[in-house]
Every structure is written in structure tokens, then in C-alpha cells.
Amino acid sequence: MAKVRGMREKCGIFGVSSEDAVRKTYYGLIALQHRGQEGAGISVWNGRIRTIKGHGLVSEVFDENSLNLASNIAIGHVRYSTSGSLSEVQPLEVRCCGYELAIAHNGTLTNFIPLRRLYEGMGIKFHSSVDTEVIGISFLNHYSQVKDEFEAMRRVFEEVKGAYSILILFDGKIIAARDPVGFRPLVFGEGDGYYFASEDSALRMFGLETRDVLPGEVFVIDGESYESKVLAREKHAYCVFEYIYFARPDSTLNGINVYCARYRMGVELARESPAEGDVVIAVPDSGRTAALGFAHESGIPYMEGLIKNRYIGRTFIMPSGRGLKVKLKLSPVREVVNGKRVVLVDDSIVRGTTMTRIVKMLRDAGAREVHVRIASPPIRYPCYMGIDIPTRHELIAAWRSIEDIRKEIGADSLAYLSIEGLKRAVGTKNLCMACLTGEYPEWAFNF
């Protein structure tokens, strides 16, 4: 099945030390399903590591028998990629230096290739092509020398560069860590046990007290007790696209609620680039919250002008024509847009092909004018820290002016949120915006 490559989150992770750990991990992964729909896995400890994983949605990979595995400790993972063999679905089991672990990783390493060559030169054999394996080997290599989880992770922080929030199942313990910059989110929860998740929305169902794992912080969960230490400090740079697109709206990351940040993006956009319109509509679902903010600030009524078909899933056999794909996923409400000046709000434009189809769809439904407003700045650069953004050549804003993009998509007007407006909306300057500015955090490339 052909896949149109767009901008996607790499994955989500979940871990728990508590009774009925496997079933709780299953529920947690379902809550993180938006972060990856192409593969899932759970690793447990009951005297040894056992891993169940497969391609597909969480509900497709696990059955009742697998959920009945007896264990009070488990980690899990959801991934987006359709490429690679089952051996590359996480958690990965890694064996090195006389030890073994299972590891789940959200992010991307920037020095994966030189590190892999280093360890291969030491005679260590790799069993996958994913960068996650390097983290596991780095940890086991250093642990074999120091016999201490914290010191081993301190050395990992010095050696491994890039974006990584990780959960490691090792010797009956869970080790959780977030890279010193804090690119990718990770949350700790405490209640009837100890929990970790990429987003706090995946922990809320368990009634826990939660907090962010700090950048450079490491947890070691050992039965009914835990210890945590901040082992490395760098200038924080939280991925801005977690707030723009990837995280669930009901999540709070780094003390900032995602829904409120997206709503403020719409407010800032309306202030910076007002439009004369009769109705504000969103590209569902990602543009909805910003569209509500835009409508409130502009005084233009918000209505649902595009309806999303929620039953086109991962296994749907897509037609070859791009236009038909968009029409299968989205349908205009003619009565909402016919004869109207429509303000269309979305979170971002990657290539521009989908937006072109949507604008035409609205015109075919009778829209008199279509004014496109994008609740983020233009994406001009690729991401090397865990978001699958296409190459720069494929990014329409990398090589075309905003006016050229407007003509390409067929809109009457086009405006993006500014960098400063985005910072105001999110409410922190500690953001990685490399895909928007081309300014990559120094630590991730200092090797």
C-alpha cells in the first residue's frame, strides 16, 4: 500500500510498576495511540524479559491472553513507521556485555551512525537498524564498568546526542530518562505504583499525582521505592510541534496546557492577520482549537464546515488519486460555506497538496472566498530530533514565498502565525523551533 509521507510524531512510551502492569500498560498505550498507529509492543519482567509486539494498532496487537501475563512491571511503545521488520518494533531487547534489557524510546539520535560504528568497532553486534539499540548498548556498556544505574546513565548523557525520552526494563527495575535538553516529553505519575508516559493525559485515568520528568533527570524504580536525580543540565528546548500538532489537547507538557496554547495561537493569528469573513472553519481535527481562538478574537462565528471521516483507518486501501484521498477523508458542509467568505484555519502546511485540494473542495461547495490562516510559522527546515518532517526540497515554504504558496493553493489570502506570536501563545522561550528557523540546538550536534 502506497503511503504519502507527511509530518508525523515518531512514537509514544508508557511504563508502570504496579499490580496488573500489563493491562495498565495496554490502556496507557491506547491513550497514546495518536502518537503512533503502525506498531505496538509491551515488555514485562517476571524473572526474565518477555516482549509481545506487532504491526498495527494497540487493539490489534494484543489479545486477552497477552494481557493476562503475570507481572508487576512493564514498559510499552507505539510507533508510527510502516518500514522495517518486526524486530524493529519496540520495545527492543538488547543484549551486551553480559547483560540484557528492553528499551522503549521516543525521539531520534543525531550521532547514531558514529556511535554505531564505535560499538561495532568494539566487536558488538547490532540486531536492528533503529537508533534505539545504540542507547541500550551504551547503557549496558557503561553499566558493565560502573555497576550503577545512575552513573551509567550519566555517561549515556555524555555520549548519546539528540532527542530521547526512554524507558528501560533492566534487572527487575524501570529506568526512565529524558535527554538534557528536554526535546521530547515524559511524565511521571505516582499513586498505587509508579507510572511514566509521554503525556499526562495517558496517566489521568489512573488517578495519579503527576509531574514532568525534568530534562536530564533519571528515575530508577525498584519495586515499591524509587530514586531520581538530575544528572545533566543543558539549555532547555521543548519541541514546539508538540504544542502545535502532536500532543493531545488535554495534555499539559512542561507546565503548559496544549489546548490553551493552541487556542492562544488562534487568538494571536487573528490579531496579526485578520480576515474579512462570514464564517471561520477548521481543518479537523488539528486546526479546530486554533480556529476557535481565531473566531473568538475576530468576532466571526465558528462553524463546522468540514467533516472528517473517522472510519478510514490504518488498513484502509487508499485509491491512487490524491484528490480522491482527500475527499474520502474530508467532506464540506455545503450549507455552512455556500455563498460565504470562509476563513479556513489549520495548524500547518507541509507540502501544500492537501490544502490545495481542500480549498478547491470549499469552492466547489459554493464558498465565495477562501482565506487560509495557519496557526504556526512556515515549516522551512527538516527535523533531526524525532519528528518525521520531509526533506527541505519537499517543504513548500522552503523554496516559495507566501504569495507563491497562496497562488499554488488557490486561496484568496494566506497568512501564517509569526515566530513571536507563537512564542507568546505557548508561553515559554525554551522551545526548539529548528524546523521553523533553521537554528538547531547546539547540544544535539556537539559530537
UniProtKB/Swiss-Prot annotation:
Pathway involvement of the protein, from the record: Purine metabolism; IMP biosynthesis via de novo pathway; N(1)-(5-phospho-D-ribosyl)glycinamide from 5-phospho-alpha-D-ribose 1-diphosphate: step 1/2
EC number(s) given by UniProt: 2.4.2.14
Residue intervals of the Glutamine amidotransferase type-2 domain: 11-224
InterPro entries xref list: GATase_2_dom, Ntn_hydrolases_N, PRibTrfase_dom, PRTase-like, PurF, PurF_N
Family of this protein: In the C-terminal section; belongs to the purine/pyrimidine phosphoribosyltransferase family.
Binding site for [4Fe-4S] cluster: C239, C383, C432, C435
PANTHER family, sorted: AMIDOPHOSPHORIBOSYLTRANSFERASE
SUPFAM superfamilies per the UniProt record, alphabetical: N-terminal nucleophile aminohydrolases (Ntn hydrolases) (SSF56235), PRTase-like (SSF53271)
Protein function: Catalyzes the formation of phosphoribosylamine from phosphoribosylpyrophosphate (PRPP) and glutamine.
Source species: Pyrococcus abyssi (strain GE5 / Orsay)
UniProt GO BP: 'de novo' IMP biosynthetic process; purine nucleobase biosynthetic process
Cofactor: Mg(2+); [4Fe-4S] cluster
Catalysed reactions listed for this entry: 5-phospho-beta-D-ribosylamine + L-glutamate + diphosphate = 5-phospho-alpha-D-ribose 1-diphosphate + L-glutamine + H2O
Cofactor binding remark: Binds 1 Mg(2+) ion per subunit.
Active site residues of this protein: C11
Keywords carried by this UniProt record: 4Fe-4S, Glutamine amidotransferase, Glycosyltransferase, Iron, Iron-sulfur, Magnesium, Metal-binding, Purine biosynthesis, Transferase
The protein's name in its UniProt record: Amidophosphoribosyltransferase
Prosequence residues removed at maturation: 1-10
GO molecular function, one term: 4 iron, 4 sulfur cluster binding
Binding sites annotated in the UniProt record for Mg(2+): S286, D346, D347
Pfam families found in the cross-reference section: GATase_7, Pribosyltran
